[in-house]
């Protein structure tokens, strides 16, 4: 699902807000979440999951075109851990023949 599909689905299901209002709310939420992670904070949405940063240590990689070794610096990457309610719901849908 893309961001525009999400906006359309929310507008269709709730019917009270315009697509511009929903789009602004989603953009604002995503921007705030990005800023929070950029400062190293953790985001927890109960019942859904948590977002945090995981550190990837420096390593030696390989250029797929040339096969040449390349030194890759260490970096932080965003990580999502689903909450129990989300995991249960996904598994419930799977059992029903998703």
Curated annotation (Swiss-Prot):
Please verify whether the record's keywords include Transcription regulation: yes
| Similarity remark | Belongs to the bacterial histone-like protein family.
Q: Which CDD domains match?
A: IHF_B
* GO BP annotations listed: DNA recombination; regulation of DNA-templated transcription; regulation of translation
Summarize subunit and interaction data from the UniProt record for this chain. Answer: Heterodimer of an alpha and a beta chain.
Alphabetized Pfam families for the sequence: Bac_DNA_binding
Q: Which GO terms describe its molecular function?
A: DNA binding; structural constituent of chromatin
- Matching NCBIfam families, A to Z? hip, PRK00199.1
Does Transcription regulation count among this protein's keywords?
A: yes
- The superkingdom listed in its UniProt entry is Bacteria
Record key words, sorted? DNA recombination, DNA-binding, Transcription, Transcription regulation, Translation regulation
A cellular component annotation (GO) from this entry:
cytosol
Role description: This protein is one of the two subunits of integration host factor, a specific DNA-binding protein that functions in genetic recombination as well as in transcriptional and translational control.
Name of the protein: Integration host factor subunit beta
Question: Which species?
Answer: Pseudomonas syringae pv. tomato (strain ATCC BAA-871 / DC3000)
Q: Which gene encodes it?
A: ihfB
């Amino acid at each position: 699902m893309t961001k525009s599909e999400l906006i359309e689905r929310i507008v269709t299901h709730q019917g009270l807000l315009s697509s511009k209002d929903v789009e602004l709310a989603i953009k604002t939420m995503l921007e705030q979440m990005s800023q929070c992670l950029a400062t190293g904070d953790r985001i927890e949405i109960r019942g859904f999951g948590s977002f945090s940063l995981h550190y990837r240590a420096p390593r030696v990689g390989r250029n797929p075109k040339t096969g040449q070794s390349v030194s890759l610096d260490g970096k932080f990457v965003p990580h999502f851990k689903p909450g129990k309610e989300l995991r249960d719901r996904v598994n419930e849908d799977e059992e029903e023949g998703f």
